Amino acid sequence: MRDRLPDLTACRTNDDGDTAVVIVEKDHFMDGFFHQVEEIRSSIARIAQHVEDVKKNHSIILSAPNPEGKIKEELEDLDKEIKKTANRIRGKLKSIEQSCDQDENGNRTSVDLRIRRTQHSVLSRKFVDVMTEYNEAQILFRERSKGRIQRQLEITGRTTTDDELEEMLESGKPSIFISDIISDSQITRQALNEIESRHKDIMKLETSIRELHEMFMDMAMFVETQGEMVNNIERNVVNSVDYVEHAKEETKKAIKYQSKARRKKWIIAAVAVAVIAVLALIIGLSVGK
């Protein structure tokens, strides 16, 4: 539990009640912000786990000629959950962005605003990274599914080019494309079912990829525009570290030079005392004579 004593003390000792309230409310505002940051982090981590589960289901589906319907249902549920969570995250990130814009010339301190801007940029980058991984997994699954269709067609004696296969996929009607080989005794019902099943999988993927495109581009463009700000922060941190290290070295040199100068002063003083003593001795002897 966070220590609230400083806040309570500020409220008690401050004669201006309004000022005390502002301090507490401001603290509460940042507490709420950091709570929201943790929620977004958890949601991004949950999407990352879902993406790993999606990849596993993709592998299972690709390894079986006719995978169980349960696996495909689970895959659809994962896709829906990822999109729902992603839309929620995007909404929260946009809300933070709008809040920062409103407070740009408001009453919030520059420190608080920089913290919120930085956290927003970091979370946006993480979000885009995990959604990029999800998008790449879908594209890979599409290509591998397309390869399975092509191999099944080759088994029937029907050689297809990539352009022809893409034309079939875009038409959405595989039955027209393979109608001339259905009567061929060389094709098995299992092979035909797999071709149609893979085609349906690809059609669902096309829809999913289109739905994600707008969201992905929106966040990717934001991260690109905010990237320079994050880079500037990183450069400032590095420069600060370099400056501190340089200052340490200069301090060491100054101490070293100061020590040498102090040592020289003591030597000069000792020599001066010795000279004075010798002169005094000579003068004393001269007077004695």
Swiss-Prot record:
The keyword Chloroplast does not apply. The keyword Membrane applies. Residues 1-265 are cytoplasmic. Residues 192-254 form the t-SNARE coiled-coil homology domain. Its main location: membrane. The chain crosses the membrane at residues 266-289. SMART domains: SynN, t_SNARE. GO terms for biological process: acrosome reaction; cell differentiation; embryo implantation; intracellular protein transport; vesicle-mediated transport. Residues 68-101 form a coiled coil. It is found in: Membrane. It is a single-pass type IV membrane protein. Interacts with SYT6 and SYT8; the interaction is Ca(2+)-dependent. Belongs to the syntaxin family. Essential for epithelial morphogenesis. May mediate Ca(2+)-regulation of exocytosis acrosomal reaction in sperm. This is Syntaxin-2. It comes from Mus musculus (Mouse). The lineage of its organism: Eukaryota, Metazoa, Chordata, Craniata, Vertebrata.
